[in-house]
């Protein structure tokens, strides 16, 4: 398994697809690892050089002591792409991964060909909400909040104990290191990218899920309206993590958008 020490942290990462094709980076959400993208990547890897990674404190990446800042996650991604020799890429980000993508594009606009911002916003939640969540997971563990989180992630139909995928992704959430989860909650709590995201000037696709309880469609739509010429699409019958519930729709939207942007 590929690991790299970059920016003072060991990151787990993987490349797939075709190294001779344009680079496409995926950044995942809070409480997940890069396996959430598997079904999407399967549909796109013939066209792109895919880069997947577990952000700091998630998956098999090192969980450094919390709290984290969003700038830490952006610097981690920058250093990883430097390590891999990726000078320019399209970046797909989900939730906090979308915030990382926004921050990376604002800091390094010359390195980003296009952005896909899925189920995210420049500002997510309130300080009180994130402080309450940090306290809950620190005192009682992630399992204590898992059911409430998963109600926002997935549709009622998906959230069945008879659905092995649901059971598996619940395990992914609850096995996330508390340090990484709480640290990244602090990063989201303290981040407000409104002004830098408003200033973006590149092809941007914003995706919402009609049953998303974490970043509702209207929040994603508001982000799209503030970005110059950004596109906005809603995926039906999905919650906060459409790459799991509707990977076909996500891959189709990404593929068409990047083709229209003349990338890949």
What are these regions, as identified by a protein language model?
Residues 125-128, 139-198:
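Conserved alpha/beta-hydrolase catalytic His-Asp/Glu region
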Residues 200, 206-208:
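Short beta-strand/loop motif that positions the catalytic acidic residue
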Residues 210-215:
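Acidic catalytic loop of the alpha/beta-hydrolase fold
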Residues 230-264:
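Catalytic active-site module of serine/aspartate enzymes centered on a nucleophile-bearing elbow/loop
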């Amino acid at each position: 398994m590929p690991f790299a020490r970059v920016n003072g942290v060991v990151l787990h990462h993987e490349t797939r697809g075709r190294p001779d094709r344009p680079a496409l980076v995926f950044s995942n959400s809070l409480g997940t690892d890069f396996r959430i993208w598997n079904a999407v990547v399967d549909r796109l890897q013939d066209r792109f050089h895919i880069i997947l990674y577990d952000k700091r404190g998630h998956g098999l990446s090192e969980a450094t002591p919390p709290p984290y800042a969003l700038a830490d996650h952006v610097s981690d991604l920058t250093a990883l792409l430097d390590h891999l020799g990726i000078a320019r890429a399209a970046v797909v980000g989900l939730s906090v991964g979308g915030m990382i993508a926004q921050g990376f594009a604002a800091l390094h606009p010359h390195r980003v060909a296009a952005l896909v911002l899925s189920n995210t916003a420049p500002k997510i939640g309130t300080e009180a909400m994130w402080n309450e969540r940090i306290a809950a997971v620190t005192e009682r563990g992630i399992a204590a909040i898992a059911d409430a989180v998963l109600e926002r992630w997935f549709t009622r139909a998906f959230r069945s104990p008879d659905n092995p995928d649901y059971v598996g992704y619940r395990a992914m959430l609850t096995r996330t290191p508390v340090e990484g989860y709480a640290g990244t909650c602090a990063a989201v709590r303290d981040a407000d990218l409104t002004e830098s995201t408003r200033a973006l000037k590149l092809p941007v696709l914003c995706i919402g899920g009609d049953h998303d309880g974490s970043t509702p469609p209207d929040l994603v739509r508001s982000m799209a309206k503030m970005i110059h010429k950004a596109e906005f699409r809603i995926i039906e019958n999905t919650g906060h993590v459409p790459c799991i519930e509707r990977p076909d729709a996500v891959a189709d939207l990404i593929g068409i958008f990047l083709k229209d942007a003349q990338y890949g």
